[in-house]
Amino acid sequence: MIDIKELKFDEKGLIPAIVQDYYTKQVLMLAYMNEESLKLTLEKGETYFFSRSRGKIWHKGETSGNTQKVKKIFYDCDEDALLIQVEAKGPACHTGNISCFYRSFDEETEDGIEILNKLYERIKGRKINPVEGSYTNYLFEKGIDKILKKVGEEATEVVIASKNDSKDEIVYEVSDLIYHLMVLLVEKNITLNDIYNELERRYKK
């Protein structure tokens, strides 16, 4: 393990820290650390950064609740940059996006994991801030029995589509099932990271 003193902080005593989702490997944000904030991160197990604009240390998620539990910290070959893998509790970006890097120079389609994360956050947002006429809010208003009924119905539709052997139909019905499963997860306050954790546990067996 490297001694913090061996890291190459810049002339202002800072080192760039790239934050990456431990499970999805999506890059979440870029921030800066000084020696003290890095020590706090190692000690507390959550990310602490140094704000260049405010000139002080800040704890990620202190006000928003979107904390980042540290899983691993890497440093590069030149010892002048950090890669921090985290288990994120909520979006990393102040805009509400999962990642601060949500804009692109081109129009390429987002990857599947990002779409799932955004869908989950959208459903969660509907529960917190209901929108009149929203089907998602209708499910939350009707409660757990209605949600479970829909999950069961959609699972049956997947079985039927699979028996019909139509790829388009299977994709459509599985998408419906995933959506309703996410509604169930939000209702039960279960995050996608909880699911990623379990899948990782099984993968390592």
From Swiss-Prot:
<comment type="pathway">
    <text>Amino-acid biosynthesis; L-histidine biosynthesis; L-histidine from 5-phospho-alpha-D-ribose 1-diphosphate: step 3/9.</text>
</comment>
<keyword id="KW-0511">Multifunctional enzyme</keyword>
<dbReference type="GO" id="GO:0004635">
    <property type="term" value="F:phosphoribosyl-AMP cyclohydrolase activity"/>
</dbReference>
<keyword id="KW-0963">Cytoplasm</keyword>
<dbReference type="InterPro" id="IPR038019">
    <property type="entry name" value="PRib_AMP_CycHydrolase_sf"/>
</dbReference>
<dbReference type="GO" id="GO:0004636">
    <property type="term" value="F:phosphoribosyl-ATP diphosphatase activity"/>
</dbReference>
<dbReference type="InterPro" id="IPR021130">
    <property type="entry name" value="PRib-ATP_PPHydrolase-like"/>
</dbReference>
<comment type="pathway">
    <text>Amino-acid biosynthesis; L-histidine biosynthesis; L-histidine from 5-phospho-alpha-D-ribose 1-diphosphate: step 2/9.</text>
</comment>
<comment type="similarity">
    <text>In the N-terminal section; belongs to the PRA-CH family.</text>
</comment>
<keyword id="KW-0067">ATP-binding</keyword>
<comment type="similarity">
    <text>In the C-terminal section; belongs to the PRA-PH family.</text>
</comment>
<dbReference type="InterPro" id="IPR008179">
    <property type="entry name" value="HisE"/>
</dbReference>
<dbReference type="InterPro" id="IPR023019">
    <property type="entry name" value="His_synth_HisIE"/>
</dbReference>
<keyword id="KW-0547">Nucleotide-binding</keyword>
<protein>
    <recommendedName>
        <fullName>Histidine biosynthesis bifunctional protein HisIE</fullName>
        <ecNumber>3.5.4.19</ecNumber>
        <ecNumber>3.6.1.31</ecNumber>
    </recommendedName>
</protein>
<dbReference type="GO" id="GO:0005524">
    <property type="term" value="F:ATP binding"/>
</dbReference>
<dbReference type="GO" id="GO:0005737">
    <property type="term" value="C:cytoplasm"/>
</dbReference>
<dbReference type="InterPro" id="IPR002496">
    <property type="entry name" value="PRib_AMP_CycHydrolase_dom"/>
</dbReference>
<dbReference type="Pfam" id="PF01503">
    <property type="entry name" value="PRA-PH"/>
</dbReference>
<keyword id="KW-0028">Amino-acid biosynthesis</keyword>
<keyword id="KW-0378">Hydrolase</keyword>
<dbReference type="Pfam" id="PF01502">
    <property type="entry name" value="PRA-CH"/>
</dbReference>
<feature type="region of interest" description="Phosphoribosyl-ATP pyrophosphohydrolase">
    <location>
        <begin position="116"/>
        <end position="205"/>
    </location>
</feature>
<dbReference type="InterPro" id="IPR026660">
    <property type="entry name" value="PRA-CH"/>
</dbReference>
<feature type="region of interest" description="Phosphoribosyl-AMP cyclohydrolase">
    <location>
        <begin position="1"/>
        <end position="115"/>
    </location>
</feature>
<keyword id="KW-0368">Histidine biosynthesis</keyword>
<dbReference type="GO" id="GO:0000105">
    <property type="term" value="P:L-histidine biosynthetic process"/>
</dbReference>
